[in-house]
């Protein structure tokens, strides 16, 4: 049985004051979680204050530095807290569960993501939402990421841009430095598979805010596209079958989550 208190949740957040409290509360109730960190990435609202009221440990970027930077900040904070709080000779690295800030109360259903990692069956899990949210224009970026991952590894994930992921500390350190901005998920998948690590997709009943078709949403997708393209540009050309050749096995198929 996995030990209790072996998972830290890291939530990058920017201007999510309307959902962050519910997200933190849901995450804090997950099995194995004893630490929830919110990294406020230059919010203009009271995201940080609300996260703190909900019980999270809050870190703040003075300006918007991007999702990957927020993930690194949160993971480093976990490491420092572990080094400070653990008695001599008892340090044990927590697994890292990354969740989006806009999950709201559905964050409490993320438990199945941690199970393969806590059981030693996977080095990273990727969420597959059982109920897809329609997002205008988002398919172009998903297609770019999925095709790039497939070219690099011979495997195409169902939801390559899904940011809900659980990693061992060793897997996270293997992937550092993280690719910038919104290219982080694409790069994580490629880099860990190339390193011979085990990646599993897990179905979970999570949901978040849909991206619209207004000007701000279109700019957001343009930034996503550019970040994913940059992450892929430095990881090609790649040989199909590289993963199987180095690790002896390919990624696992989608694993149904257990409630």
PLM regions with names:
Residues 15-29:
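Short, well-formed alpha-helical segments that are part of the catalytic scaffolds
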Residues 39, 61, 99-101:
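Catalytic metal- and UDP-sugar-binding loop of GT-A-like glycosyltransferases, i.e.
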Residues 1-3, 177-179, 183-259:
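Hydrophobic helical membrane-anchoring modules
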Residues 40-48, 103:
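A conserved acidic beta->alpha catalytic loop
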Residues 84-104:
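Short beta-strand-to-loop acidic/aromatic patch adjacent to the donor-nucleotide binding site
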Residues 11, 32-42, 59:
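Short beta-strand/loop segment that forms part of the nucleotide-sugar
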């Amino acid at each position: 049985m996995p030990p209790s208190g072996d998972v830290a949740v890291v939530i990058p957040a920017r201007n999510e004051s309307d959902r962050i409290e519910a997200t933190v509360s849901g995450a804090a109730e997950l099995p194995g979680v004893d630490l929830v960190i919110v990294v406020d990435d230059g919010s203009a609202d009271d995201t940080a204050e609300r996260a703190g009221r909900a019980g999270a440990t809050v870190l703040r970027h003075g300006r918007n530095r991007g999702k990957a930077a927020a993930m690194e900040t949160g993971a480093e904070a976990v490491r420092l807290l572990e080094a400070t709080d653990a008695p001599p000779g008892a340090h044990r690295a927590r697994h890292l569960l990354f969740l989006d800030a806009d999950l709201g109360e559905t964050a409490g259903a993320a438990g199945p993501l941690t199970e393969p990692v806590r059981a030693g069956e996977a080095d990273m899990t990727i969420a597959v939402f059982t109920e897809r949210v329609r997002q205008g224009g988002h398919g172009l970026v998903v297609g770019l990421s999925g095709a790039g991952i497939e070219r690099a590894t011979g495997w195409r994930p169902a939801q390559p841009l899904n940011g809900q992921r659980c990693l061992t500390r060793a897997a996270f350190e293997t992937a550092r430095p993280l690719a910038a901005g919104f290219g982080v998920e694409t790069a994580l998948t490629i880099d860990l598979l190339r390193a011979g690590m085990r990646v599993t997709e897990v179905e979970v009943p999570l949901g978040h805010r849909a991206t619209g078709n207004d000007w701000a949403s279109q700019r957001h997708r343009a930034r996503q596209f550019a970040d994913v393209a940059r992450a892929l540009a430095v990881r090609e050309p790649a040989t199909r079958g590289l993963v199987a050749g180095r690790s002896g096995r390919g990624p696992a198929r989608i694993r149904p989550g257990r409630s």
